[in-house]
C-alpha cells in the first residue's frame, strides 16, 4: 500500500514537471505560430479549467504555506492568458473568426446590442481591476512588510524555545525553514499581484485595439461595410476579452482568497475556508436572531416582497434558535465540569464527577456515594477545590496533580473515600450542611499536604522546569546538563517528605547545579541542598524568633549511628539494632514530653541527620530534625536535653 502511494506521488510529481515544461513551450508557440480555431477552443477551455481548479484549491488549503508555488502559478497562468490573447487576436483579424467559445461568449454578452456588451465588459473589467486586483495587491504589500518585520522576533522566539528545551533541534530546524518559506511566499505574492493587475489593464487595451483594428481590417481587407465590420469584430473582440477576463477574474479571486486567509494554530489539514466561515458565522446565536428580527421588519416596508423577507427571517431565526439550543446544552454540560480538578498544565476537556471509575489510576482520587454525588453543587465544589489548590501552591509550591472523582455503589449514605494511587487513605461520612462542598474539597486535598512527596514524579518535575525556563532558561539548561530529571525529582521528593516547600525552586536548582556533579549519594546531595536553603529553614525552625529549643545528641550517639550506616547498591540505610534504636527514640520522647513547646526540634550533624529523622518519624511525626550546618550561626540553640547511649 505504501509503495503504491509513493509510486503515485512520484508519477504526479513527474507529470507536473512535464506539464510546466509543456506550458512554457506552449506560451512561446502561441505568441509566434498561427493556430486553428479548434486548438484555440481547446486552449481556452484548459485556461478556464486551470482558473477554476486554482480557485477551488485555494479554498481548501489550510494555510498559505501549503500552496507555496502560488506566485509562480500566477506568473504562468498570466502568461498563458496573454499568449492566448495574442493567438486569438491573430485569428480574429486574419480570418474574422476565433472558435466557438469566443463567438458564443461574444453573442451571449453582447446579446444583439453592442453598447450593452461593451458596458458589461467594462463593468467586469472595472470590478476586477479596481476592487479585486487592487485590494489583493494592497493586502499582499502589507502582508509582505509585516512578515519581514516580524521575522527577527519569530527567529528569536524559536531560539529561546530551543534553549529552554521546549523544542528539539529538528523541530527548531523545521520552524526556521517554515519561517523562511513564509517570508519568501509573501515576498513572491507581493510581486506576483502586479501580474494580476497588469493582466486586467492589458485585457482592456487589447479589446479596444481589437475592435478598432477589426473595423479597419474588415473594411479594408474583407470588403465589409463599417457597420458590419463593427458588429462582427466587436462580437469577437468582446467574446475574446470576456473569456480572458472570466479566467483572470477567477485567478484574481483565488489570489485574494490566498493572501487574505488567516490560519489559526488549531487548524488541521482538513480545515478549509468554507468550514472556517461557517463555524465563525454561526458561533453567535444572538446575532442570527437579531438579523432575523431585522429581516422581519423589512417585510413591512411598502413595496418590499413581504413573503420573501418573512421566509428569510424564519430561516435565519430557526438557525439561530438551533445554535442557541446546542450552546445551552454544551453550557449545561460545562457547568457540571470541574476545571479546578484538572492536573496543573493539563490540556483537553475539564474533568467532572464520573459515573464510573476511570480506566487508569490517578495520583489522587475520590469516590462518592450516589446520594452524596446527587447533593453536591458542581459549581461550588469547583470553587472550593480552586481555593484549596491556591493554598497548596502557596504553602508547598507543589503543582496540583489533579483529582478524579466518581460514584460507586460500594459507598452508602453520605460516605466518601479518598485514595492515593488507588490505595484508600481516608473514608468518612459527610454531613449535609451548607459548606459541605468546602469540607469535601478540604478532605480531598489534605493528603497533598501530608504526603506531598507521593505526588512528585518525572512529569511534574519536567513541568516545573518548563515554567522556570520561561524566566531562567540558562539555569534550567545548566541543571539539565548536571543531572537527569529523575534525579531532580528524587531530591524534590525528599524535601517535600520533610515538609520543606519547593516554592523556592530557583535556589534549589542553583544548588543542584553546584553539588550535583560532585555528590553522587542522593541523601548527601539532599543535605547540601538543605544547607543552601538554610536561611529559610532557620526562619521556619525558630518561627522568626532566632531561638530554638533543641534536643541534642551525644557525640557517642552520633558515632554509633555513623558506624551503623550500611552502603548497598540500592543506597545507604541504617542498620542499628532495634533495641538500641528503641532506647534512643524513648529518650527523645521523654525529653520532648517534659518540654511541650513550639518551636522544638532535634539537632544533629549533617551526615547523620537524615538517619535520625528516619528513626523517630514513625513515633514523632511532627518533630523536625535539623543539622548544625543548615541552621547556621544565626540560630541560638537552647538545649533542653541530651540523648546518650
Curated annotation (Swiss-Prot):
Keyword Nuclease: no
Keyword Cell inner membrane: yes
InterPro entries the UniProt entry points to: FHIPEP_1, FHIPEP_3, FHIPEP_4, FHIPEP_CS, T3SS_FHIPEP
Protein's cellular compartments: Cell inner membrane
Keywords in alphabetical order: Cell inner membrane, Cell membrane, Hypersensitive response elicitation, Membrane, Protein transport, Transmembrane, Transmembrane helix, Transport
PROSITE patterns documented for this protein: FHIPEP (PS00994)
Leader peptide range in chain numbering: none
One GO CC term, this protein: plasma membrane
Source domain of life: Bacteria
Transmembrane spans: 18-34, 43-59, 108-124, 201-217, 243-259, 285-301, 308-324
Record membrane topology: Multi-pass membrane protein
Major place of residence: membrane
Chain segments carrying region Disordered: 334-354
Function in brief: Involved in the secretion of a proteinaceous elicitor of the hypersensitivity response in plants.
Family membership noted in the UniProt record: Belongs to the FHIPEP (flagella/HR/invasion proteins export pore) family.
Protein name: Protein hrpC2
Organism: Xanthomonas euvesicatoria
Amino acid at each position: 500500500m505504501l509503495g503504491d502511494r509513493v509510486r503515485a506521488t512520484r508519477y504526479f510529481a513527474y507529470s507536473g514537471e512535464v506539464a510546466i515544461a509543456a506550458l512554457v513551450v506552449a506560451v512561446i508557440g502561441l505568441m509566434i505560430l498561427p493556430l486553428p480555431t479548434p486548438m484555440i477552443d481547446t486552449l481556452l477551455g484548459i485556461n478556464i479549467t486551470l482558473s477554476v481548479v486554482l480557485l477551488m484549491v485555494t479554498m481548501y488549503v489550510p494555510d498559505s504555506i501549503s500552496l507555496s508555488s502560488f506566485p509562480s502559478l500566477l506568473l504562468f497562468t498570466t502568461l498563458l492568458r496573454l499568449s492566448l490573447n495574442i493567438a486569438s487576436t491573430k485569428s480574429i483579424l486574419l480570418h474574422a473568426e476565433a472558435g466557438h467559445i469566443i463567438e458564443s461568449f461574444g453573442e451571449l454578452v453582447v446579446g444583439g446590442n453592442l453598447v450593452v456588451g461593451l458596458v458589461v465588459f467594462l463593468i467586469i473589467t472595472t470590478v476586477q481591476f479596481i476592487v479585486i486586483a487592487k485590494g489583493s495587491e494592497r493586502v499582499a504589500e502589507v502582508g509582505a512588510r509585516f512578515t519581514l518585520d516580524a521575522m527577527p522576533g519569530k527567529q528569536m522566539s524559536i531560539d529561546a524555545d530551543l534553549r529552554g528545551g521546549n523544542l528539539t533541534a529538528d523541530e527548531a530546524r523545521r520552524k526556521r525553514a517554515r519561517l523562511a518559506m513564509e517570508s519568501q511566499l509573501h515576498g513572491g505574492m507581493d510581486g506576483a499581484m502586479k501580474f494580476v493587475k497588469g493582466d486586467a489593464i492589458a485585457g482592456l487595451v487589447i479589446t479596444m485595439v481589437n475592435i478598432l483594428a477589426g473595423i479597419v481590417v474588415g473594411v479594408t481587407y474583407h470588403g465589409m461595410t463599417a457597420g458590419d465590420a463593427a458588429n462582427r469584430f466587436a462580437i469577437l473582440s468582446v467574446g475574446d476579452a470576456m473569456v480572458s477576463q472570466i479566467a483572470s477574474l477567477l485567478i484574481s479571486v483565488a489570489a485574494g482568497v490566498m493572501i487574505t486567509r488567516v490560519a489559526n494554530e488549531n487548524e488541521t489539514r482538513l480545515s478549509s475556508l468554507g468550514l472556517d466561515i461557517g463555524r465563525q458565522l454561526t458561533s453567535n446565536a444572538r446575532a442570527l436572531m437579531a438579523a432575523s428580527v431585522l429581516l422581519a421588519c423589512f417585510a413591512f416596508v411598502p413595496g418590499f416582497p413581504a413573503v420573501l423577507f418573512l421566509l428569510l427571517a424564519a430561516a435565519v431565526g430557526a438557525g439561530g434558535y438551533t445554535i442557541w439550543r446546542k450552546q445551552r446544552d454544551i453550557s449545561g454540560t460545562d457547568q457540571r465540569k470541574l476545571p479546578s480538578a484538572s492536573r496543573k498544565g493539563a490540556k483537553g476537556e475539564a474533568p467532572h464527577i464520573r459515573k464510573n471509575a476511570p480506566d487508569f489510576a490517578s495520583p489522587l482520587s475520590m469516590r462518592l456515594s450516589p446520594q452524596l454525588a446527587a447533593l453536591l453543587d458542581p459549581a461550588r465544589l469547583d470553587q472550593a477545590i480552586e481555593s484549596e489548590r491556591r493554598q497548596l501552591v502557596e504553602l508547598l509550591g507543589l503543582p496540583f496533580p489533579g483529582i478524579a472523582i466518581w460514584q460507586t455503589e460500594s459507598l452508602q449514605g453520605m460516605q466518601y473515600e479518598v485514595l492515593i494511587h488507588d490505595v484508600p487513605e481516608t473514608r468518612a461520612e459527610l454531613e449535609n450542611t451548607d459548606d459541605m462542598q468546602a469540607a469535601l474539597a478540604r478532605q480531598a486535598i489534605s493528603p497533598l499536604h501530608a504526603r506531598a512527596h507521593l505526588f512528585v514524579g518525572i512529569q511534574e518535575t519536567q513541568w516545573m522546569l518548563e515554567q522556570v525556563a520561561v524566566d531562567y532558561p540558562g539555569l534550567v539548561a545548566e541543571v539539565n546538563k548536571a543531572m537527569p530529571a529523575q534525579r531532580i525529582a528524587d531530591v524534590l521528593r525528599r524535601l517535600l517528605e520533610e515538609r520543606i516547600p519547593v516554592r523556592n525552586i530557583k535556589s534549589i536548582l542553583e544548588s543542584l547545579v553546584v553539588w550535583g556533579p560532585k555528590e553522587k549519594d542522593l541523601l548527601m546531595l539532599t543535605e547540601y541542598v538543605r544547607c543552601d536553603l538554610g536561611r529559610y529553614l532557620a526562619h521556619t525552625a525558630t518561627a522568626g524568633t532566632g531561638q530554638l529549643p533543641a534536643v541534642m545528641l551525644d557525640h557517642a550517639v552520633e558515632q554509633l549511628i555513623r558506624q551503623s550506616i550500611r552502603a548497598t547498591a540500592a543506597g545507604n540505610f541504617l542498620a542499628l539494632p532495634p533495641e538500641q534504636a528503641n532506647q534512643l527514640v524513648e529518650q527523645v520522647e521523654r525529653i520532648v514530653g517534659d518540654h511541650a513547646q513550639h518551636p522544638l526540634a532535634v539537632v544533629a550533624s549533617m551526615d547523620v541527620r537524615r538517619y535520625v529523622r528516619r528513626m523517630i518519624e514513625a513515633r514523632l511525626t511532627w518533630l523536625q530534625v535539623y543539622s548544625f550546618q543548615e541552621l547556621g550561626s544565626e540560630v541560638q540553640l537552647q538545649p533542653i536535653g541530651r540523648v546518650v547511649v
